[in-house]
Amino acid sequence: MAYNSYATPQQKPSDEVERLPTEAVNIWSHQRAERIGAFLRIALACVLVATFGGMPVHARVKKIQISVKESPTFGGYSWPGVGQYEKIVGRAFGELDPKDPKNAVIVDLQLAPKNANGKVEYSFDFYLLKPIDLSKGNHKMVYEPPNRGRKTIAALNRGVGAKDPGSVQDEALLANSFLMPQGYSISFSGWDASAGISSADFNMTIALPIARNADGSPITGPAYEYIVNPGASYVLAYPAATLDQSKATLTHRVHLNDIPETVPASGWQYNADGTSIGLLPAGTAFVKNDIYEFSYVAKNPTVNGIGFAAVRDWNAWLRYETKDDSGTPNPLAGDITKIYTEVSSQPGRLLNDFRYLGFNQAENGKQVFDGMMQWIAAGDGISMNYRWSEPGRTERNRQDHLYVEGRFPFANVMSRDPITGKTDSRYAKCELTHTCPYAMEIFTANEYWVKAASLMTTDPTGTKDLPDSPFTRIYFMSSMQHGTGRDTIRGVCQQFQNPLDSQAVQRALFTAMDKWATAGTQPPPSQYPKLADGTLVKPEQNSTGFPQIPGVSYTGFKTTRYLLNYGPNFYKTGIPTVNPPVFTAPYQDNPANGPIYPSFVPKTDKDGNDVAGIRLPEVQVPLATYTGWAVRADPQSPDGCEGSGQYIPFARTKAERIASGDPRLSVEERYGNMETYSSMLRDAINNLVKAGFLLPFDAERALHKNVKNVTSQNLLTQK
């Protein structure tokens, strides 16, 4: 039988920053699309009635194709009590019933091509690591939905996890890893169409269908692109429905609050098939770091919401089924008792919407995930389950404001939206089906400034704090940027990047989550700024208390959450009729852009370090000011520097401080000598261990790292 076109975008670099905890370099924030038409034929087997515990097959992973099986992997390394691991890599093929109420929430699923059984088909890459002898494992699995196709688990796993984790053969690194010594199985799978079509370097991809009108004709509609740093051409997420330039508008500006200038039709062109645009004369590059916006009529929308079901059904299949429809055995059949997710940023936003939309209930009615480590995802959703969506996009205080990301409900507990009158929470659906996962919501100061994270802990009117959900804890990593930067690199920012690293805290909280899900042991109390105690404040400098530091710009600019107008029925149908919505300068708290959800930022101490939250040893016993926000250097100054924070060192001596006019005490004035500094540092680390925010192994490393940092710079005398 014939199938309609399937599509997967082609990777393409962008300057939009999404920093990973183990990387100081940028990863692509969104990869663009080159639609490919293909007849994707998936071998259909007769429907087998496989059973697991008396349950019929529900998780519609129909077939897996294994391309790599390496046993043992990790160079044959064997962990005491667990033994050796094996690696299994391949492609999984799934199908969805559009009539199943659990799938009905997926926008445009009814308009996707269907097979002879009336099902919608898709496929994705998977990568699995497991003990060869499952009886020696702990019968639990960690699942990571990759960040734009890329694995980020190395942060949690003490350095083992990038690209092809099984290729690591460094015995010292493997011995000190976090997950394998405990016997965890680890899985990754494709879900995000913006990850491209190439599986090179074990990039995790997904092939999704293109929606069409009921009569088979192409769907067209208004689409929008935010463009920064594309070079001489820009590949559109969706091809243009017409090459008529009068149906499109390209604008350009240098600063966020500048008035956009329209580029005349004589200044740009489509390529021959309408899949990209470029400036004229041909070969002219877009100005680096300037803002271009393109609105046009697009065609062939991908059904991106299938990515939610792909995550659900892959994990449900591994957990509850014994084999695929062709009889290929499930490598983890009968072994899994718990599944925990681990994410970094973008896929955490995926799982925010995953929970909200009810996807933690499998098609067989059972729970999929038991616990979620939600690292730097805050209360945002993802640009995925609507027509013309782009999952690779991420809104910050300069970029991507007009992609649907920050929508009510923001919190895990019930609150009332004063704009629409709706009462809802991210956990409302799973509470009804008794399938709610425990979750550790861990985010940084950057998420308050560029992601409006305070909406996760306040009501939408911004007048009161919300209580914890019984299923979640919220942990604010004080003074951190979005991930970990390098304190020797400025990039496009005015100051050096913020080097604070939360990997050790994540391991402690993962351990606490496991105990919570397994034994009911309560994790450490939530730690975050609050309105009630004055640690959550307005962004103006006289409210935050941030000091006047010579050479440091303070703008107080934060991202504002609006209820944007995409057309009268958008929030019911997921289909925009107005795109882009009206959005004009100034962009912060401007009622002209729509009703506002008030948001706030953390208060700082006299050094400029955040007061509330989990304060790392470097923040409790500081040698610098660390911020979660940053300002761009010229020519884009004073725009925000997106995911970056700042590292602003203290003067070494009192004389240096006075000479520069710095109000912050010098290192010498604070500590006097190395002995005092080391003692204070040790106390701070021990207190974090007692509070459950550091494991003993990581505590020793933290002490050694910070002492070495001071001695290598000769900041203090010994006594």
Predicted segment positions?
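C-terminal His-loop and adjacent cap/lid subdomain of alpha/beta-hydrolase
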Residues: R60-K719
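Long, compositionally biased, charged low-complexity segments
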Residues: G37-A38, R657
